[in-house]
A protein has these predicted regions:
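N-terminal and secondary-structure boundary signal
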Residues: 1-279, 295, 299-362, 366, ...
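Short Fe-S-cluster ligation motifs
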Residues: 396-404
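Ser/Thr/Pro/Gly-rich low-complexity, intrinsically disordered segments
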Residues: 281-287, 291
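Generic short N-terminal amphipathic or hydrophobic helices
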Residues: 289-290, 308, 399
């Protein structure tokens, strides 16, 4: 069966617009009643990598979280908490002052800090046979992932699948980078983790995404989209296509399909665009050509659902080509380098040679110390060993290549 990915075009963090589009998008996934039982304990898991200004696109935008929280409350869901195993700091520390804390207070959703890690067996895992997961996560009956559209130095992109790494408790995240140092082993572990925790569905904030040196130090870039799906691999594959990256070049997509988490191939993904009514006539015949405001598609053929979803909102089943033509960004700064699969690259991979690693450019370094303070490794893998008047130095024997 095809996986359905919902695309919500939205050019600003406007709560009312996001709320309306998201609510109608959820109806395309069968509605919340078919996804979540009213009595279930719900855990919302945004991307809270570290404390940062929301404009820097490091964390899931508070307005996206707030709009979804509003929908949950209006639909009668009562038992809801929000948490993440943050890269730096606690959940409460990271959200303080971002506006997310204000939304959570408004909708009476507590932000909780994980207090205890529990070792759980994962006998069916391909890469990871056990995890250390937070007690509070294990107590939840329904997990909803609210990721951020970003690049990632190791996995090329971080989205729905990678967001689940925030399920791992505390310092065990740093240990995981050491235990699974290659892009492939880390990706397989992430697939195992998603299959173990089984988030009910996934939302990706891509209104302002991050390109370049992600996931923590890249540049904000407007993509003007929110993506939703019950299939994280399909969701990340659409993200990849939107930035002109072949989905199978993303290790979590490649292994995600191979290991049965979801669909990576285009023919197995149905894309539905839920958008504001582009004209006075919201409902068109199926198979008609879109013109006028949507001329950017250059008369691309789309299949249009005859049912109008909500006031001034329409639902279009659209081809991947038409989606990319209208909403894609070929200039998005992401690693599109092809990985050569010959005897030398296999040998280098086996011996951990030519691994990607962080590097400080002495001419550009301002000696701010952020890299030193952010390093999660006990004893620090980067420090001012040559004095604070000189750039910090990495100890690659200690470095876990977290790229945070």
């Amino acid at each position: 069966t095809k996986s359905k990915v919902i695309v919500l075009p939205c050019e600003a963090y406007d709560e009312e617009r996001i709320y309306t589009l998201m609510k109608n998008g959820l109806s395309q996934l069968g509605g919340l009643d078919n996804l979540i039982n009213k009595e279930e304990k719900i855990l919302l898991k945004p991307n809270l990598l570290k404390k940062a200004e929301v404009e820097k696109a490091v964390i899931t935008h508070p307005v996206v979280v707030g709009a979804f929280a509003r929908i949950l409350r209006e639909e009668g869901y009562k038992n809801i908490v929000l948490a993440d195993s943050c890269g730096h700091g606690t959940t409460k520390q990271v959200i303080q002052g971002t506006g997310m804390d204000t939304y959570l207070e408004k909708y009476q959703i507590p932000a909780i800090d994980y207090t205890k890690g529990v070792r759980v067996e994962n006998p069916d895992g391909v890469q990871a046979k056990e995890f250390i997961l937070p007690k509070e996560l294990l107590e939840a009956e329904c997990v909803i992932s609210l990721s951020k559209m970003k690049t990632h130095a190791l996995e090329r992109i971080t989205g729905a699948v990678k967001n689940s790494y925030g399920f791992v408790y505390g310092k065990n995240k740093a240990i995981g980078h050491t235990k699974y140092p290659s892009a492939d082993s880390f990706a397989r572990m992430l697939i195992d983790l998603n299959q173990h925790v089984k988030p009910r569905f996934y939302i990706m904030d891509g209104i302002t995404a991050m390109e370049g040196n992600g996931p923590g130090s890249g540049d904000p870039v407007a993509m003007n989209l929110i993506l939703m799906s019950t299939d994280p691999v399909a969701l990340d594959s659409v993200f990849a296509r939107l930035v002109y990256l072949k989905p199978e070049m993303v290790p979590t997509n490649y292994h995600g399909e191979k290991m049965g988490l979801g669909n990576c191939r285009e023919e197995n993904i149905e894309v539905v665009v839920v958008e504001e009514n582009p004209s006075a006539s919201a409902v068109r015949d199926e198979g008609s050509e879109i013109t006028g405001r949507e001329k950017q598609r250059q008369n691309a053929k789309v299949s249009v659902d005859k049912k109008q979803i909500g006031i001034d909102v329409v639902c279009n089943v659209i081809s991947m080509e038409a989606l990319i033509e209208k909403y894609g960004n070929p200039n998005f700064n992401v690693d599109r380098t092809k990985v050569r699969n010959n005897v030398w690259t296999k040998l280098a991979k086996a011996l951990n040679i030519f691994q990607k690693k962080p590097y400080i450019e002495p001419d550009k370094c301002i000696r701010c110390g952020i890299c030193v303070n952010s390093c999660p490794v006990p004893g620090k893998a980067v420090d001012f060993r040559n004095g604070k008047n000189n750039p910090p130095v990495y100890d690659y024997k200690k470095c876990i290549r977290c790229f945070c």
